[in-house]
From Swiss-Prot:
Physiological role: Catalyzes the transformation of pimelate into pimeloyl-CoA with concomitant hydrolysis of ATP to AMP.
Record keywords, A-Z: ATP-binding, Biotin biosynthesis, Ligase, Magnesium, Nucleotide-binding
Top EC group: ligase
Organism: Staphylococcus epidermidis (strain ATCC 35984 / DSM 28319 / BCRC 17069 / CCUG 31568 / BM 3577 / RP62A)
Associated pathway: Metabolic intermediate metabolism; pimeloyl-CoA biosynthesis; pimeloyl-CoA from pimelate: step 1/1
Protein name: 6-carboxyhexanoate--CoA ligase
Lineage, broadest ranks: Bacteria, Bacillati, Bacillota, Bacilli, Bacillales
Encoding gene per record: bioW
Molecular function as annotated in GO: 6-carboxyhexanoate-CoA ligase activity; ATP binding; magnesium ion binding
Length: 228
């Protein structure tokens, strides 16, 4: 297996990114796919593109994908309450999402106090070394959901994680999601207005979580997601 990562930006502002793990014979297809994604993204033109390929040497951990639960009546406040995330912590997370800073990774907050627990500043925590081995999906929208579920599954597969809130920073994509070990993966429609780059990924955790081990799991452990 090989890890392939793409990051594209304009004047150091993040435009697009993608990542997966695949077999050698699939590398060329992913390189073409990520190249085209970078140069044809709705967020604008790029002046920098990085494509990185590494052989996966560490053992791969298998994770079962979070179930997709569709409920048009879901609200963030209700979901947060059901997963042990305080209203104050939820609002702090939304502040990070709505500010004008572009974070390239996730932000970790206390689910109780809303205090930021990671110290990565604008970089954030990057979930890497992952691939969705099997997925019952098709079409462009389902491709987005597949990638999002893979990330959500990894983020929520560690003791002490309460939930995750994600809002895309793509200009015209207004569907976000709220995911948790307890409630699964739930899309939230019209979570932001069209035409804005506001977005971000917030992870709500217990303050007693082994933060160093969690970050290492997200950033360095190879993870393969499968359907149940």
């Amino acid at each position: 297996m090989y890890s392939i990562k793409m990051r594209a930006s304009h004047e150091d502002i993040h435009i697009s990114g993608a990542e997966t793990m695949c077999e050698f014979e699939d590398l060329e297809n992913y390189l073409k796919k990520y190249f085209n994604k970078a140069f044809n993204h709705e967020n604008g033109n790029i002046d920098f593109l990085n494509l990185k390929i590494e052989k996966v040497k560490a053992p791969i951990q298998t994770l079962v994908a979070l179930p997709v639960v569709e409920n048009l009546n879901d609200t963030l406040t209700q979901l947060a309450k059901q997963t042990g995330v305080s209203e104050y912590a939820l609002n702090k997370g939304l502040e990070f999402i709505k500010n004008d800073i572009t974070y390239t990774g996730a932000i970790i907050l206390s689910a109780q106090t809303g205090q930021r627990l990671d110290s990565t500043e604008q970089r954030g925590i990057r979930v890497t070394q992952l691939a969705f081995k099997t997925c019952k999906c098709n079409g462009e929208i389902s491709e987005r959901v597949k990638d999002a579920r893979a990330l959500a599954t990894c983020i929520n597969a560690f003791e002490g994680v309460k939930a995750e809130l994600c809002v895309s920073d793509d200009l015209h994509y207004t569907t976000g999601y709220f995911a948790s070990p307890k409630l699964g993966y739930r899309r939230i429609f019209n979570i932001k207005e069209k035409g804005t780059r506001h977005g971000g990924r917030i992870i709500f955790v217990d303050e007693g979580i082994n933060l160093n081990a969690y970050v290492s799991f997200l950033e360095t452990v190879p993870k393969e997601i499968i359907e149940k």
